Each structure stands twice: as structure tokens, then as C-alpha cells.
Amino acid sequence: MTPYEMIKAHLSRAVPYATYTGVTIDEVGAGVARASVPMRPEVSNHIGTVHAGAMFTLAEAASGAALAGTFADNLLSLRPVAAEASIRYLKVAKGSLTAAARVDGDVEAVRATLESEGKVAFPITVTLTDEAGVNVAAVTVSWHVSPLRV
């Protein structure tokens, strides 16, 4: 099993709230990830579309998976914390959703900063699309990563 496969398997179980909402991590790579959430009553709102909170949960989970992929080789020795997030709801989200997350900038530079400075802060952008391929939200999550404190 590759480090990316292990991350994918672990993240799908590690965050109970994301699991409760039905979020699954579909792909993980170096600084990238894809996640999805099926449309079901538990994630719907008062007008029968995807609830804004479910959209945010999906985006945050995808960003966390992209972060994990960035540090796949030493993730267990790190303490990642989502420090800030912003979301722009672009369209009504209809049906199942997919999130595509990507580290902004150069993944190697992010790793090098952690190595040289002992900590790093960087943004991950996430695009949410619905079943029809319509972009329904744009999200940025700023992460802070430092060594795990024992």
C-alpha cells in the first residue's frame, strides 16, 4: 500500500464528523486531493439542495487530504491545524458534490519551508462541483503545520 493509499484509507475513518456527513476521500496525491459527498436527506437544506455546512465540510476535508498528501512521508510526526477558511457560494448545489483541492504554489517549497523553519503556513484552494459539473463554491483553507508536540 502506498503512503497516499494509506492516507486515503485513514482519513476516511479518522474524522467522525466528515464520516457522519458521508464525505469520502477519493484520491490523494502530492498536494492534491479529491473528495465527494452524495446527495441524501442528511446533507440537504430547506430548499432540497446541498446544505452550506455540508459543502464546507466537504471542502475542508478535501483540503486536509491535500495537506496530508503533501507530507505523506512524515505526516505522523506533524501537527496540521486549519487556521482560517473562506468560502464563496457561487451557485445552488444540486445533487452529489465533488471537491478538488490543490496546494497553492510549489509543494516542494512548502516542504522546504517546514524543513528549514520548523513550521509552515500555506493555503489550499478547493473547487466544489455538482453532478452537472457546475462550479458551486470556491474555498480557501489556510493551514499551519508544525512538529507534533508530545
Enumerate the predicted regions with their spans.
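Extreme N-terminal tail/first-helix region
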Residues: 1-16
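Residue-level preference for beta-strand/loop junctions
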Residues: 17, 31, 79-81, 95, ...
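Short structured motifs
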Residues: 19-25, 83-89, 109-111
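Catalytic strand-loop segment that frames the active site of acyl-thioester-processing enzymes
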Residues: 20-50
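Residues located in well-ordered beta-strands
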Residues: 24, 86-88, 100-102, 127, ...
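Hot-dog-fold acyl-thioester-processing enzymes
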Residues: 38, 42-64, 76-77
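Hydrophobic beta-strand-centered segment that forms part of the acyl-chain substrate-binding groove
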Residues: 66-105
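HotDog/MaoC-like acyl-thioester-processing domains
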Residues: 93-94, 104-150
